[in-house]
Amino acid sequence: MIKTITSLRKTLVLPLHLHIRTLQTFAKYNAQAASALREERKKPLYQNGDDVYADLDWDNLGFGLNPADYMYVMKCSKDGEFTQGELSPYGNIQLSPSAGVLNYGQAIYEGTKAYRKENGKLLLFRPDHNAIRMKLGAERMLMPSPSVDQFVNAVKQTALANKRWVPPAGKGTLYIRPLLMGSGPILGLGPAPEYTFIVYASPVGNYFKEGMAALNLYVEEEYVRAAPGGAGGVKSITNYAPVLKALSRAKSRGFSDVLYLDSVKKKYLEEASSCNVFVVKGRTISTPATNGTILEGITRKSVMEIASDQGYQVVEKAVHVDEVMDADEVFCTGTAVVVAPVGTITYQEKRVEYKTGDESVCQKLRSVLVGIQTGLIEDNKGWVTDIN
């Protein structure tokens, strides 16, 4: 019996050249399968005139990751200048285990969107402001950054290369994520020796699961988002993981998001987990002043200007939590959330309801902003860039 098994094993052992041939065959079939999968992914759902769309359920996008076909990659040379970037298929990137971004969190990101007009043309909304904000953030994180022209060009190329992933008008937007990171290896604490700038994209719908319904927020008193002198005013990646615990706890209790208070007195409103906050009382709209702990949102800035144009008194100041609980309306702004109404806020077991709906200040401001972003309202401010 033992001899039989030994003999059988000998017959099953292949020569080295046959092993290699077998592995090559498997690799060939794997490559063919991957290629077939990519081609299947490229099949359009439908074609409307000259517009071809990717195979997605455009009516139920949500805010999940559906990677578009291409990403833009640009490296920083040793002299601190960024080289010519290029488009490449979306996919994984290689990083050393000792990369600065992995060990010390040296990275910042931006968020912008491409919008499709009714005629199929694509628009960007104030991408130059994202570029400027990234430069300011890079200075704070001691990183070189792309020039404004390099940044905007990268965003344009990414949007155009992924045009079929831009949702049909009224179905959503193409969320574009520029990311700047310390990709070079380093052991001791210090700036990375190399930096990589990547821009990738994903079609998205509403950020919150509530869609356009009003949000229910919880005022967080234990955890804080940022402190004076820190990096709360820039889009550092280090600002976001620390909010997950408070956010998860709030969601488990049925809330949409968390409102953070200042870290010193814990009495003044700062912002939500990923968006700015506005408080409406009569014809006055207040929002927390940017003092280094609050992100200077581009949507925030745009909404403030639209509100001023409509005759509201817009005030940037320290907003006491008691003012929030006595407000007529509260709403949030951001690239992802756009302009989102707040239905209730809970603070120290007290729950307050706010005005929402078509006649609310929030909805009026949102309608104007979205109208400009999508080309339905004439842009007389120079905010929109046609990239066709």
UniProtKB/Swiss-Prot annotation:
Recite the UniProt keywords alphabetically: Amino-acid biosynthesis, Aminotransferase, Branched-chain amino acid biosynthesis, Chloroplast, Plastid, Pyridoxal phosphate, Transferase, Transit peptide
Q: What reactions does this protein catalyze? A: L-leucine + 2-oxoglutarate = 4-methyl-2-oxopentanoate + L-glutamate; L-isoleucine + 2-oxoglutarate = (S)-3-methyl-2-oxopentanoate + L-glutamate; L-valine + 2-oxoglutarate = 3-methyl-2-oxobutanoate + L-glutamate
Write down which residues bear the modification named N6-(pyridoxal phosphate)lysine: K235
Q: Extract the SUPFAM superfamilies matched here.
A: D-aminoacid aminotransferase-like PLP-dependent enzymes
Any one GO BP annotation for this protein = L-leucine biosynthetic process
Gene3D superfamilies attached to this UniProt entry = 3.30.470.10, D-amino Acid Aminotransferase, subunit A, domain 2
Question: Which residues does the annotated transit peptide occupy?
Answer: 1-22
Instruction: List, separated by semicolons, the cofactors it needs.
Output: pyridoxal 5'-phosphate
Residues folding into a coiled coil are none
Q: Tell me the route in metabolism or biology where this protein functions.
A: Amino-acid biosynthesis; L-isoleucine biosynthesis; L-isoleucine from 2-oxobutanoate: step 4/4; Amino-acid biosynthesis; L-leucine biosynthesis; L-leucine from 3-methyl-2-oxobutanoate: step 4/4; Amino-acid biosynthesis; L-valine biosynthesis; L-valine from pyruvate: step 4/4
EC numbers = 2.6.1.42
Subcellular locations according to the entry: Plastid, Chloroplast
The first-level EC class reads transferase
Q: Which GO terms describe its cellular component?
A: chloroplast
Database matches in PROSITE patterns = AA_TRANSFER_CLASS_4
What domain of life does the native source organism fall in? Eukaryota
A Pfam family found in this protein is: Aminotran_4
Q: Which GO terms describe its molecular function?
A: L-isoleucine-2-oxoglutarate transaminase activity; L-leucine-2-oxoglutarate transaminase activity; L-valine-2-oxoglutarate transaminase activity
Q: What else is known?
A: Branched-chain amino acids are synthesized in chloroplasts, whereas the degradation takes place in mitochondria.
Q: Which NCBIfam families match?
A: ilvE_II (TIGR01123), PRK13357.1 (NF009897)
What family does this chain come from, according to its entry? Answer: Belongs to the class-IV pyridoxal-phosphate-dependent aminotransferase family.
| Main function | Converts 2-oxo acids to branched-chain amino acids. Shows activity with L-Leu, L-Ile and L-Val as amino donors and 2-oxoglutarate as an amino acceptor, but no activity for D-isomers of Leu, Ile, Val, Asp, Glu or Ala.
Q: What is this protein called?
A: Branched-chain-amino-acid aminotransferase 2, chloroplastic
Which organism does this record belong to?
Answer: Arabidopsis thaliana (Mouse-ear cress)
